[in-house]
């Protein structure tokens, strides 16, 4: 029942490999399937260098459908999307959600993007952190997303200025709102390969999420086929250590629980 819930395609202009190549690696890792979640098109020119264009959306849907048919009976391939959120994007995102039958809609705030920094960074990094965590909560409150992706990504922007203790107040306020909205949050293993060497989110944030009974979704944010299910074993160990007993997947935009013990047993080593 374990799926890779966060992965990309070359249409985002910074990933390599077709969906079938990701499926092949998923099969080797013992996964039941993958949900392709490439970066969404926008209708206002927001960060066009890291996403498909509106004119490429039909190609994206067809690419995933072709792979689904090719791999049917071996690896279950589903269509998803990772959509950027900032306040004011809601009408377009609502339209986009109706343009295809998505199985998993990730909501993302990318504070390292130039467009985001230009609009929201005032020179005060502490204030920037507050804005970021406020936007995560706002994204959840829209009801447009199943899962909030890589939820402490702001630490990547300026590592020398990131202060977790300072940010915890903003984090907890954000988590209160996300929990009330009933939105899941991602545990993204790509953070283990950064200078921090920790998940997105970090352990203290995971503990606060657990206190609020926020369900978690595991994803590697794979931009290369070889990254499918990367470090899932480590992430499951960390989640168990924190106190989580289940992870979740979304299929047909419905959340399904998987015991961590079951997920761990499903994974194959390569």
Residue locations for each model-derived region?
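A structural motif
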Residues: 31, 102, 144-145, 214, ...
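Extended substrate/RNA-proximal surfaces in nucleic-acid metabolism proteins
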Residues: 47-181, 263-270
């Amino acid at each position: 029942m374990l799926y890779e819930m966060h992965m990309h395609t070359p249409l985002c202009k910074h990933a390599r490999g077709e969906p079938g190549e990701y499926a092949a690696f998923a099969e080797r890792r013992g996964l039941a399937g993958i949900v392709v979640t490439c970066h969404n098109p926008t209708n206002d020119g927001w960060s066009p260098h890291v996403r498909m264009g509106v004119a490429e959306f039909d190609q994206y849907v067809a690419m995933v459908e072709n792979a689904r048919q090719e791999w049917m009976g071996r690896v279950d391939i589903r269509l998803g999307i990772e959509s950027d959120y900032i306040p004011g994007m809601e009408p377009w995102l609502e339209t986009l959600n109706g343009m295809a039958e998505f199985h998993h809609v990730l909501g993302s705030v990318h504070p390292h993007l130039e467009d985001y920094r230009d609009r929201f960074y005032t020179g005060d990094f502490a204030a920037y952190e507050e804005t970021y965590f406020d936007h995560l909560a706002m994204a959840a409150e829209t009801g447009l997303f199943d899962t909030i992706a890589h939820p402490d990504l702001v630490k990547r922007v300026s590592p020398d200025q990131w202060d977790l203790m300072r940010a915890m107040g903003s984090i907890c306020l954000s988590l209160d709102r996300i929990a009330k909205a009933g939105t899941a949050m991602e545990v993204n293993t790509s953070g283990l390969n950064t200078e921090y060497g920790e998940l997105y989110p970090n352990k203290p944030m995971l503990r606060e999420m657990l206190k609020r009974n926020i369900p978690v979704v595991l994803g590697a944010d794979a931009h290369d086929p070889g990254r499918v299910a990367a470090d899932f074993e480590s992430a499951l160990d960390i989640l168990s250590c924190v106190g989580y007993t289940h992870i979740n997947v979304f299929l047909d935009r419905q959340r399904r629980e998987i015991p961590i013990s079951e997920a761990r047993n499903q994974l194959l080593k390569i």
